């Protein structure tokens, strides 16, 4: 064997031995990494895919302070815009009047579109006056096909876990933090997972109907899947419109405020989207308030701008402060581990970490299912999984439910159905 051939064999042996620290392959890899890292733009390009939020300071995102808000702009009339009456009755004269901005101090977010890009500005304020203590501007930027393909492959590989979590969503065995996390990932999931999340949201809203935080009209809207799914986590009573500016809306309470630029004005929504639903029987019942119509127009008008609304900021500063902490790494996600799936090159160990987090959510749901089984005292047949726990899956009243199942002794109220698994 010649000397040159012997040298070539030595190199091949070194390439094959990847376990050696000074192997030819490892040396070459380190050199390539050092070359790319020496590029000043490497870190910025790498960070671009760390999460949907790309921090930027080059865009001016400001909105005039709104001291007065309204539930529905007084100049916006369904009858005037459509040329016909929908039979809507105004329940309270307060709905058309101006309301003092309830925000007293805390976190303020602004969602705005500039040059076909969505931006979110987060500001810490000590009062409703514009006195920012700390602020940050993010651009919402996602390689949608990449993330959808990645999560599709994940659910295909982990089909059993995916189906199990979907079943728990569909039957009401979930905690609110688990629901919030996966609702924020809704746009990147497969159609089957999206369908289960809508079923979970129907359960969530129906439970809120029984506690008088939502109405039957809101339940009808979520059943029709109107608008962006995450906006159903916002209490309808916290949604306002700007005074004299129908292209802007506000979501606010005493400790949180978000000013959102709508994707299309309510006037456009009335003419383009509302006619699809105006012939529904619920619109002829004459029980819908003007405030509910205003909320519907908000849901139809916000469009894809809802993707940039940080729902976890709203919840963390209102009812979920002790349950859902705000993670500063990305304002569009609820957990840091979710940022990893947005990287351009996701390593196998990263998806394994995400799988473990997915498994934790599944374990939480299974524990809730076990507790509900013990509480109810009996198992629901496998073929009868259409009725979620403690809620209405349709506009069927409790009386109708008892009559359909031939159960005597019903009461005329809106308490939940008997728990069944």
From Swiss-Prot:
The keyword Cytoplasm applies. It is found in: Cytoplasm. Keywords: Cytoplasm. InterPro entries: Meiotic_expression (IPR013903). One of its GO terms (cellular component) is cytoplasm. Pfam families: UPF0300. This is UPF0300 protein C737.04. It comes from Schizosaccharomyces pombe (strain 972 / ATCC 24843) (Fission yeast).
